[in-house]
């Protein structure tokens, strides 16, 4: 029993460690991208109600293949539109503004920006089971613009 609990604890800990580092501060992300010569990846999500958003998080964002690529190439920004949890007013205002600015019509939406905030490409939706390799390939195609 102890070994089973230890194994489960290791699995949960390793999944948490694989989670890429995301910020919610758009302006700080642009500044960081400029300083580090990276792109910005915006994830427009409904974290507590959007099933495909949850699958994208579980099947892609927690996987080593995505994390390794993202850490080298992007500053990651979560732009969340939850229904159950309350966001601080300034974050809600920022997210609403970004949703309007980028004309978000569905969730999840991934948008790649250069460090000046110019859109290089977007993916709307997530194909369950496609995994990190498909998402990374799509993101790489935006980097060539």
Model-derived segments and spans:
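Non-catalytic, surface beta->alpha helical segment in thiol-disulfide oxidoreductase systems
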Residues: 59, 97, 101, 105-145
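Hydrophobic beta-strand anchors of alpha/beta hydrolase catalytic cores
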Residues: 41-42, 50, 76, 110
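Short pre-active-site segment immediately N-terminal to redox-active cysteine/selenocysteine motifs
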Residues: 37, 45-49, 106
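Sec-dependent N-terminal signal peptides
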Residues: 4-14
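Thiol-based oxidoreductase modules, predominantly thioredoxin-like and allied folds used
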Residues: 22-23, 63-93
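Conserved redox-active cysteine motifs that mediate thiol-disulfide chemistry
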Residues: 45-61
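A short beta-strand-turn-helix
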Residues: 22-40, 70
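Sec/Tat signal peptide C-region and signal peptidase I cleavage site
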Residues: 15-20
